[in-house]
């Protein structure tokens, strides 16, 4: 299986210049090949493959723009493949039409492929060998076993540099368990399980809200594109980075526990994009990060031989009695947190009952 290991890197000034050049050239090639593809389609109504785009880059662009030859060839090829993937997504998955990349994008990255030992990680010296960069100082906080396939170098909005090493490795699956669980995703709490376990919503944005408001106020008073503007902008990015890392770390702990203890995991397939259109809930939904939790559950379930099922958004999990199946319309009112079933007399906590129904529906689907 393929697994990525992310490390922070500390390039020297010469390496930073080369990385910046590679970011710029990859963006240039992406935009040029996207424009080429668009032009051919508009003129000739002909589809252009990624191989055609790659040939166009090698035969035309590199001839007209000599400086492209200074850049790692795999990085340019992968930029073209990324453009092609965005194009395919537009046709097959009804995503938006691929956009031209801007040099002002906050997140910059490029990917290079392993060949003839051009990528290597030395845990003794704390350095990573990368094409065109030679040995880059890195914080190698965890080791891996396996064959390197590629490396993605990135720079985030706070200015920090990272490299993600993609490795083909063996993964030992977790031991089989007979325990299954349903999960009700919430805002007050991150999620509640059919066993009655509550995973709290840490509300990380709320903890940093005052600091962010203060920094953003300072930013609005700075002269745009001035030195102080960029300094303050970097502080805002660092604060957002802390929030993102804390949230991700907590979600990894939650998803690991859920996957470790259960064989079948069932949750709702929430339409998050539509839900964040509600301006009253948008910030809370973004902070609780349902998408990231379900993403982690999905890939960790695949890794460990578990089943992760998403049931229909419109399944009436909160209205059904998990004991007898009676549908209680009164529970459409979100303020109803506990209720007694008029048919069988069972007492219910709204969220735990919903989680039990979610589990029942998931198990029914795979029966």
Question: Where are the regions a protein language model picked out?
Answer:
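Non-catalytic, well-ordered alpha-helical scaffold segments
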Residues: 17-20, 24-27, 74-81, 252, ...
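Stable alpha-helical structural segments in soluble proteins, enriched in small hydrophobic residues
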Residues: 33, 79-90, 352-362, 366
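Generic detection of short hydrophobic beta-strand segments and adjacent strand-loop junctions
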Residues: 7-9, 135-138, 198-201
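Acidic carboxylate diad motif detector
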Residues: 52-156
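Hydrophobic/aromatic-rich, well-ordered segments within soluble, folded domains that form packed cores
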Residues: 9-13, 88, 296
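Positively charged, helix-rich recognition surfaces that bind polyanionic ligands
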Residues: 142-144, 157-367
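Long, hydrophobic, amphipathic alpha-helical segments used as structural scaffolds
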Residues: 34, 38-41, 87, 91-98, ...
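Gly/serine-rich nucleotide phosphate-binding loop at the start of the catalytic core
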Residues: 1-76
């Amino acid at each position: 299986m393929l697994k990525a290991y992310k490390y922070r890197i500390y390039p020297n000034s010469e390496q930073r210049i080369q990385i910046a050049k590679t970011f710029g050239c990859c963006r240039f090639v992406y935009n040029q090949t996207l424009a080429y593809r668009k032009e051919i389609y508009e003129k000739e109504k002909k589809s252009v493959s990624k191989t055609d785009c790659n040939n166009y880059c090698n035969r035309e662009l590199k001839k007209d723009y000599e400086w492209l030859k200074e850049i790692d060839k795999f990085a340019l090829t992968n930029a073209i493949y990324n453009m092609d993937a965005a194009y395919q997504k537009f046709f097959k998955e009804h995503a938006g039409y691929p956009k031209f990349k801007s040099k002002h994008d906050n997140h910059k990255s490029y990917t290079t492929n392993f060949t003839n030992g051009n990528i290597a990680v030395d845990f003794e010296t704390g350095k990573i060998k990368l094409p065109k960069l030679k040995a880059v100082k890195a914080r190698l906080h965890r080791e891996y076993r396996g064959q390197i396939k590629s490396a993605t170098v990135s720079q985030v909005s706070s200015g920090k540099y990272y490299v993600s090493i993609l490795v083909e490795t063996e993964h030992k699956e977790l031991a089989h368990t007979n325990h299954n669980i349903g999960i009700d995703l919430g805002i007050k709490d991150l999620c509640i399980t059919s066993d009655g376990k509550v995973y709290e919503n840490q509300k990380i944005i709320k903890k940093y809200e005052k600091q962010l408001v203060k920094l953003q106020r300072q930013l609005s008073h700075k002269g745009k594109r001035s030195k102080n503007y960029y300094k303050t902008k970097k502080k805002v990015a660092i604060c957002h980075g802390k929030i993102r890392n804390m949230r991700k770390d907590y979600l990894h702990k939650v998803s690991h526990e859920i996957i470790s203890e259960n064989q079948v995991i069932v949750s709702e397939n929430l339409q998050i994009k539509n839900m964040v259109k509600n301006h009253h809930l948008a910030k809370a939904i973004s902070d609780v990060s349902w998408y990231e939790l379900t993403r982690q559950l999905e890939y960790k379930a695949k890794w460990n031989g578990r089943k992760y099922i998403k049931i229909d958004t419109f399944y009436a999990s909160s209205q059904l009695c998990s004991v007898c199946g009676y549908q209680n319309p009164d529970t459409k009112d979100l303020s109803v947190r506990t209720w007694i079933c008029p048919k069988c007399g069972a007492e219910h906590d709204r969220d735990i009952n919903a989680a039990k129904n979610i589990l029942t529906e998931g198990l029914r689907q795979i029966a």
